[in-house]
Amino acid sequence: KVYMIWNEKKLTESSEQFFSGLEKLDNKDFEKSAEIFLNSSLDQKDGYRVLSIFGLAHSNFENGKISEMVSNYQTIYEDKTIGNYYQDLARILSVMKDNKSNFSELQGRLKPILNSPSKLQLLAAELQIVLFIRFNKLDKARNSIKILLARADITQEQKNRLSLIDKVYNSHAK
């Protein structure tokens, strides 16, 4: 019974610490939120660990610490004890927010999602198109758009986005 009380108290403290970090994020106190999330993420047994690493990554992004942000996301996607969905989400966020890495590095982070039956595969494929455009690989972007538009499993919203991108870049190519 003493262990259960101690364990419940520990969980309450962890949740309060995590939500305090979220509050600091909301108030744009990114240095303080990073400090809180770092402390939360170091507790390996805590249920808030993964969420705290995501919070730390976002705090580092807001502080302009892109290398640290990438490292935080890498901690998530390389940890085999963390679920695939969260690993894939960390990969996608690291690519979306990273304005320093080169094309090969960014595409390398997306490859595991693109080559697996992930729930986030279509989103990663769209993000790859954005990378092609960002790095001026417009032929690859147009080809990827064609391939994605031919898939039966894309949503109407995705079709609309891809069609719009295709129209914009095809009109500039003429």
Predicted stretch roles:
Residues 28-81:
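Extracytoplasmic/periplasmic/luminal assembly and interaction segments
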